[in-house]
A protein has these predicted regions:
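A low-complexity, Ser/Thr/Gly/Pro-enriched, surface-exposed linker/loop concept
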Residues: 35-61, 104-119
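Short, tandemly repeated low-complexity microdomains enriched for cysteine and small residues
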Residues: 27-33, 53-60, 90-98, 117-122
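A structural feature that tracks compact, well-ordered secondary-structure segments
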Residues: 6-8, 16-20, 24-32, 41-45, ...
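N-terminal segment of the canonical double-stranded RNA-binding domain
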Residues: 1-12, 47-75
Length: 122
């Protein structure tokens, strides 16, 4: 299987999406009130993720515009969020024990997101 975006139903007649590989979710979104908004967010990721900078917040780095942020959790694990130019988080990952796993998630979306199919399962 290839990398793919999946749009699925969420609570309260809303929609969410994820970016996965072989059925394993790498990134997932918040809920959207309209399916069109979820589709728009996916298109924004496809367009903006490949050239986005990475700010490692665990090293007190900062960033602006479209960017990936590596965040250290309270239990010394790491997760990634992709932030839009307006400062809103678009998607995030699970927490990883190793920062390298967080970096791999970023590289996967940068490399494989633009060409990934979108499966509308909602």
């Amino acid at each position: 299987m290839a990398h793919k975006f999946h749009i699925t139903p969420a609570a309260n007649e809303q929609f969410k999406f994820d970016f996965s590989y072989n059925g394993e979710k790498i990134f997932w979104s918040e809920n959207y009130k309209q399916k069109a908004s979820a589709k728009s967010a996916i298109e924004s990721l496809k367009k903006n993720a490949p050239g986005a900078a990475t700010a490692d917040l665990s090293k007190d780095e900062t960033g602006s515009g479209y960017r990936f942020e590596i965040v250290k959790s309270k239990d010394d694990q790491f997760f990634v969020r992709f932030v839009a130019s307006n400062g809103e988080t678009m998607v995030r990952t699970e927490t990883y024990k190793q920062k390298a796993s967080a970096t791999n998630a970023i590289e996967s979306l940068k490399k494989n997101g633009p060409g990934a199919d979108v499966a509308d399962e909602a």
